[in-house]
């Protein structure tokens, strides 16, 4: 695969856009998801866009990478026009392949999403959308992840407007090293948005269910399911804020160290 950058529709458009920021877009719902098409359309008003996304949905893949089998890159068209590239792997694979074999230089910013369903609380750990942004941060790229708090009847109107506005702000202000913004947006009209909160990652978690079924030979198999249980009741926490129609903007770090626990553990005086 030869290297490519964003492909505007004409040479004139490419020339006029050459000084605009270059935006790499990814997701975990796959390149056919409505969310990434809405995001790409919005980001084209901010800069030059390159879309590199999984060929198929890879939700809840977290920071998984593909090892032991090849990855394949293909150009993807929407309505007869070039839209982006598919990678036969995970969201993190997409970022790695984009930087090594699709783009000729690092993008100015990486924007992941728009995800179906919130990525708050412990969902942050499972999310391929967030992981793509974290991989961007690991690679030294300013990165954002956007999620819409619904799995059905998604309305991306306000989400894309806010994503565009925040992306411009981050391009102007920057972010601390190894830090992304995970942005969770209620699925309501703009008139019902209560505001924007700089929120902490909450503690809400899934109450798991493994539903047992049987195949034609009588062998059991299982579908993982469950429901997210609200464990925080503070507007400072992401899931609680989103449920009250606030946009939750949460800074997430690549560093998973629990610094508050270090002093106590040092008192254990562990020896070899």
Swiss-Prot record:
Stated family: Belongs to the SurE nucleotidase family.
UniProt entry tagged with the keyword Metal-binding: yes
GO cellular component: cytoplasm
Main location: cytoplasm
Listed name of the protein: 5'-nucleotidase SurE
Cofactor note: Binds 1 divalent metal cation per subunit.
Pfam families on file: SurE
Organism the protein comes from: Chlorobium chlorochromatii (strain CaD3)
Cellular compartments annotated: Cytoplasm
Any one GO MF annotation of this record: nucleotide binding
EC class name: hydrolase
Reaction(s) the record says it catalyses: a ribonucleoside 5'-phosphate + H2O = a ribonucleoside + phosphate
Functional summary from the UniProt entry: Nucleotidase that shows phosphatase activity on nucleoside 5'-monophosphates.
Cofactor: a divalent metal cation
Gene giving rise to this polypeptide: surE
